[in-house]
A protein has these predicted regions:
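Non-transmembrane, aqueous-exposed alpha-helical and coiled segments at domain scale
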Residues: 304-307, 313, 319-350, 357-406
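Short coil-to-beta-strand
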Residues: 65-66, 351-353
Length: 451
C-alpha cells in the first residue's frame, strides 16, 4: 500500500522545485495554489504502488521482446466527457484493438490508456489571438477553460482538484468495465466481427477475423473457459506535466519506502519538457513508476543515453520507455542511430512509436489534422527500422477516441478535408476515430506478422 509522504521523502521528491520547469501555469493567486496542493497531499492514491510494479513487470517483457504495448486515448481529456458513455466507447475501441494485436503478434498485449489524468497539454505559444484579442492559451481543463474569454483563460488551481476527482471517477468506471464482464474476449471479438462486416476495408481483415473466430471456437469445443477471457488487465497513464499536481500525489510505498507518483500507473515526459537539467526529468528520476520519454526528430543518441543514466541507472528492464515521435518523413533516417547506440550501451528499454505528433498540419479550413496514411507510414517506418536492426518494435502510442469524430483525414471510411467541420470535437489535437483506430490495429497486426 502507499501512505502519505513524510517530511524527509517530501524533500527528496521536491528537488525539482529548484530547477527550471517548462510549461507551468502562471497562477495569479499563489496562496490559493498552496492551499490546493496541501489538500491534494491529503487525498487517497488513485493507483497503488503494487499496480505500478505490475506494469513495470509487463513493460520489462516488452523491453525483452516478449510483449507488445497498446497505449491510447484522448489528446486531452475534458471534464465534460467524464461519462459512462464516453469512457465505455474509448475502452471498447482499445479492447478491440488489443484483441486483434494479441492474436496477430502471438504475444501478450499490454493495454495502457491515455486516460484518468490526461487533462493538461503543453503548448507551443503562451497566448492565442483571435480578431485582435490576445488571451492566455488553453492548457487543458486542469489549468483553464476552453472558452475564449478573459475569465475562462485565467489559470485556476481549483481545477487541479477537479482533475483528481475526474480521474478517480474515470478509473472507477474503467475498473468496473474491465472486471465486470464487459471486457470478455468473446464479446470483444464479436464487436470486431461487426466492424469487419461494416468496414469498407473489411474484406482485407476478414481472414484474420476468421482465424480468431476459429481459435475461439476450438477452445470452446475443448471446454476451455479461463478467467482471463472474462477480465482484462488495464493500466492508466498520462503526461507528467503539472509538477505541483504530480508532486502532491507522490507517496511513500509502505513496503519498500520508495516514492511513487500515485496519480497514474505510468507517466511520461513530453518533447517540450524533457530538458536533462530541468525539473521534469529531476522529478521523474525520484519516482519508481514506469517512465516514458517522448523523443522527437531533434533527439541525439547522446541525449538518449543520458536519459538512461538519469532515469534508469540500474538498467532495469521495464523502467524506461522511449516513445518515438519523428514524423513519417523522418523516422527512417533518425531512428536507426538512436536504437543502435542504445542497444550497444547494454540498456534494455522499450521502444514505442507515437505516429501522431510528428504528422500534424493545418488544413485550409483552419483545422489541425493528420492524414491516416502518414500515421500508418510512420508505424511502417518504425517496424522497418527495428526489423533491419534485429530489435523489437515494442508498441504503438495513439491519440484516439471511441466516437465517430471527423478530425483525421483518410482511413477505410475515407474522411476528406471538407468533412472535418462535421464532428471536429477535440479539445486540442486531432484524434483517430473508432473506425480509423481499428483500421490501424488490423494493419499493424499485418506488419507484426511480417516481422
Amino acid at each position: 500500500m502507499t501512505v502519505n509522504a513524510d517530511s524527509r521523502s517530501v524533500a527528496a521528491q521536491a528537488t525539482w522545485r529548484s530547477l527550471p520547469a517548462a510549461q507551468q501555469p502562471e497562477y495569479p493567486d499563489a496562496e490559493a495554489l498552496r492551499d490546493v496542493i496541501a489538500e491534494l497531499e491529503s487525498y487517497p492514491p488513485l493507483v497503488f504502488a503494487g499496480e505500478c510494479d505490475q506494469l513495470r513487470a509487463r513493460m520489462a517483457a516488452v523491453a525483452r521482446g516478449e510483449a507488445f504495448v497498446l497505449q491510447g486515448g484522448d489528446c486531452a481529456e475534458s471534464f465534460d466527457a467524464v461519462s459512462a458513455e464516453h469512457i465505455r466507447a474509448k475502452l471498447k475501441t482499445l479492447l478491440q484493438m488489443g484483441a486483434v494485436l494479441t492474436y496477430a503478434a502471438s504475444v501478450p498485449v499490454v493495454k495502457v490508456g491515455r486516460i484518468a489524468g490526461q487533462y493538461s497539454k503543453p503548448r507551443s505559444k503562451p497566448t492565442e489571438t483571435r480578431d485582435g484579442v490576445t488571451l492566455p492559451t488553453y492548457r487543458g481543463d486542469s489549468v483553464n477553460g476552453f472558452d475564449f474569454t478573459e475569465a475562462a483563460r485565467i489559470p485556476d488551481p481549483e481545477r487541479l482538484k477537479r482533475m483528481y476527482h475526474a480521474s478517480a471517477s474515470t478509473l472507477n468506471l474503467v475498473r468496473a468495465f474491465t472486471t465486470g464482464g464487459y471486457a470478455d474476449l468473446r464479446q470483444v471479438h464479436a464487436w470486431n466481427q461487426d466492424f469487419v462486416k461494416s468496414s469498407p476495408s473489411g474484406q482485407r481483415y476478414e481472414q484474420l477475423a476468421r482465424e480468431i473466430d476459429n481459435a475461439l471456437n476450438f477452445m470452446r469445443a475443448c471446454g476451455t473457459d479461463p478467467a482471463e477471457f472474462q477480465t482484462v488487465e488495464f493500466f492508466s497513464s498520462h503526461e507528467a506535466l503539472l509538477l505541483d499536481y504530480e508532486s502532491a500525489l507522490t507517496r511513500v510505498d509502505s513496503r519498500t519506502g520508495q516514492l511513487y507518483d500515485v496519480s497514474g500507473h505510468m507517466v511520461w515526459i513530453g518533447e517540450r519538457t524533457r530538458q536533462l537539467d530541468h525539473a521534469h526529468i529531476e522529478f521523474a528520476s525520484r519516482i519508481r513508476n514506469p517512465i516514458g520519454i517522448k523523443l522527437g526528430p531533434s533527439t541525439t543518441a547522446e541525449e538518449a543515453l543520458q536519459y538512461i543514466e538519469r532515469l534508469d541507472p540500474e538498467r532495469e528492464p521495464g523502467r524506461l520507455t522511449f516513445i518515438v515521435r519523428m514524423g513519417a518523413d523522418k523516422i527512417r533516417d533518425k531512428l536507426p542511430e538512436l536504437v543502435e547506440k542504445v542497444t550497444a550501451s547494454g540498456a534494455t528499454v522499450a521502444w514505442i512509436t507515437d505516429p501522431m505528433h510528428g504528422n500534424t498540419y493545418e488544413a485550409a479550413s483552419g483545422h489541425k489534422t493528420r492524414r491516416f496514411d502518414d500515421v500508418l507510414d510512420e508505424v511502417k517506418g518504425f517496424f522497418e527500422v527495428h526489423k533491419s536492426l534485429g530489435t523489437h518494435p515494442g508498441g504503438i502510442h495513439v491519440e484516439l477516441t471511441g466516437d465517430d469524430v471527423t478530425e483525421c483525414v483518410g482511413g477505410g471510411d475515407e474522411i476528406f478535408v471538407d468533412d472535418l467541420h462535421q464532428r471536429y470535437e477535440t479539445a486540442c489535437d486531432p484524434r483517430l476515430n473508432r473506425s480509423q483506430s481499428l483500421d490501424l490495429a488490423f494493419l499493424v497486426a499485418e506488419m507484426y506478422r511480417d516481422q
